[in-house]
Amino acid sequence: MLFDLIGENNILMKHLKTIVFALLVVLVASNWSCADARVRNRVHRNNRPRMAAVVVGAERTGEYLKLLKGKRIALLSNQTGVVGAKHDKHTLDLMLEKGLNVTTIFSPEHGFRGKADAGEHVSSSVDEKTGIPIASLYEGKSRMPSKETMDRFDVIVTDIQDVGLRFYTYYITMVNMMDAAAAYDKEFVVFDRPNPNGMTVDGPILDMNLKSGVGWLPITTVHGMTMGEIALMTNGEGWLNSGKKVKLTVIPCKNYTHKTRYQLPVAPSPNLPNMLSIYLYPSTCYFEGTPVSLGRGTDWPFQVYGHPDMKGYNFSFTPKSRPGAKTPPQMDKLCHGVDLHNLKAEDVIAQGMNLEYVIDAYRNLNIGDKFFTSFFDKLAGRTYIREMIQAGKSASEIRAMWQDDVAKFKKQRRPYLLYPE
């Protein structure tokens, strides 16, 4: 009996050892497989292709130093002309470090430091850091420099961040300077920068009978082009007032396409403080031609809209005087309206130029023709937008009117594009 029990125990022990061994094999194999998977995943992540950083034209010194060496240079720029990984150096400083002879600075709307209100008079001055004279192009009625100023240099270099709208004035300043360069036989160079709205072409082509300081060329409202491309098209299409062509060189960006979602390192103007304001700008800027506040004097310019007499809204705001918006529309008045500043950027981009906001305010205020100022048609570039809103048409019906313009402009601009669409 005793020997039978011992025999049975030995058999059980053998089976137990076999089971334990099998479990150990499975456990080790499992751990090895997991470790191998972790290694594979780590290698995969490390090898994942990364989008190369955009290099702006000003940073590509090898492309322009030979062109500019030994010449007297006028730089048309503002606070957006920054370079470097940290965006903490101005193009002016880089040019001086490289031994280039910058004799004059031209400043556009908002001034060289970008602090002035829209359209505000900006006096000529001297750059405190370098001692180089700054000639303001927003000092008087004329946007053209004097002969005395033009005699100070041989070549004009432009480095300004645009946002891709027909009514955003930086491209107009550039085109005026191209006219001056052509008239005085000066070279013209553009250090190109990405267009944050470069993925979009929308709106009607400007009726040139409505040409103004917020609409200068026969282009769509949202043109989707960089400053360099606009310069090439202006030259190529014969759009300069003189009818002449300027000796033009564009230093293009690197690693950029028109589908690139480029984040601006510096606000292009005081009331476009973030990317959402830039994406909403094509839609909400029309309120500049109405009594409705678009948020100037608040933390959300171009990202809210309202009026003291608008009714039925839960959101309200009060515009206040502040730097960059000294006397905003409806200042110190409680405005009722719509908050757009929490919208997703992707949704705003997908909508394109959206007239629903203006139509909503027009119908809510119900003041008829008093809703529109003469400035509205200049912004719109066509009278039919105002007329169709007054006639009760929908945003989609109005949008259908400019689709032929969009197709025409896309075809016309194609030879001048520097970057893939």
Regions found by a protein language model. Name each.
Residues 254-331:
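Glycine-rich, aromatic-lined ligand/substrate-binding cores of catalytic
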Residues 1-48:
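Bacterial Sec-dependent N-terminal signal peptides
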Residues 113-119, 189-211:
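Glycine-rich, charge-decorated loop segments at or immediately adjacent to ligand/cofactor-binding or catalytic sites
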Residues 162-174:
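Glycine/threonine-rich flexible loop motifs
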Residues 103-110, 191:
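Short internal beta-strands
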Residues 211-282:
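Conserved anion/nucleotide-ligand pocket segment
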Residues 123-153:
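Glycine-rich oxoanion-binding loops at beta->alpha junctions
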Residues 301, 305-403, 421:
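Conserved functional hotspot residues or short segments at active or partner-binding sites
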